[in-house]
Amino acid sequence: MKIYNVMQYGAKGDGKTNDAFSIQHAVDDCAKSGGGRVVLPSGYVFYSDSIRLKKNVDLHIQKGATIKATSNIDGYIRPNKLINDPKTALIGNPVTGKPSFVFIYAYEADGCSISGEGTIDANGHAFVARKDQYYVTGDFYPRPTVMYVEKSNHISFRDFTVVDAPFWTLHPAGCDDVLIDKIRILNDLDVANSDGIDPDHCSNVRILGCHVTCADDCICLKASKGNSEYGPCENIIIDGCTLVSTSAAIKIGTEGVGDFKNVIVSNCIISRSNRGLSIQIRDGGCVENVSYSNIIIETRRFCPDWWGTAEPIVITTFNRDENTKSGTIKNISFFNVTAKGENGVLIHGNEDNIIEDVTFENCSIELTKTSKWQCGLYDLRPCLDYGVESYDNSAFFIRYAKDVNIRKTKTRWGNLCDSYSYAIDAANVENLNLYEFDGKSAKENTDDIKIDRVKLNYKK
């Protein structure tokens, strides 16, 4: 592999001089020669405008090296500035999936990669402002995406650390054969929308051994409207990750005009998070064949500005607005999942789209009050007809579903609050199948299981 050291292209690495020209020159020469490695050497801080990564080029950030994003918004690549949508062109749009400003950008760059044990400092606090002690507002724009790679195959991201993202951190869109291996993302837990890893209409993705802390979803599979030309989000493996989020640790949706299928999530630990595992479909896409196994989840409530009410597992499908329709969700399984938090499992379909074939086996769900924030709520946002709804909290809260199987699973209660209630609260469920279920009500003289228009099959 041919090496291109940015110092030989005039980079200073003093943390003050803008080294973008030197880094880009090295990338361009590397690409012209057929590919190789562009090295940011150890011991230097490279302050830089945006970089455009190219085909078969590995941007290698050595251990002890940092590339720091400029605070000057005019120094960022604007891949969608010509889009006939002023909002998208200026600030980006999470539903369309099209970013406004990007720090490291690639398009049609097969074989590109970022590697090394160095650091990408995204300089996020140059683009946000604090709203209160719990929340850094998303109302200050533009906020750049850190890495956006579109229509590029056989790409990889290995070993490096990202800190202080102002917006989404790693967003591959329309890519096939994506490896994300042992990267660290350490974002401010108060900065809204600082997603960790967002594969969007991507296929054959492996996310392995990563540690992510962020103030939005740590890992979020998307099928956004703006990238719908690229097909479904499918064949995804997430394994061996440790995750902390003020939103959902691992989510499918809500951006889902396309389909999601064949997803395996295993051997992950989720701690200090608002939600654990979440499937939220709002734009007509469908989800099928998703398996979660060997996962530990710890949830708690955060400030009400954050969506979610500490549900360890969420499966919902609703219309986002008047112009969208909910999609279908089926064949979802949970094996050996241990969850402890302030709320229970939420499964909520609707009359038009019943959630089908959901299985829990060898799982443990414990509700225990740990924060100062209100209980007795379920958060169904974003959707047309519901918001944050008031209900007693149950270990399993199920609405509009079919063939829900709960096997060899137990529910428990820790520190109680007044809203803690049933082991299972189910309505409009066809075939709720319980086998060796061990669950009691949180309250004396209250049924363990509450059902309404439910066909229940119970084998102790």
What are these regions, as identified by a protein language model?
Residues M1-K460:
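Extracellular/periplasmic carbohydrate-active domains that bind, remodel
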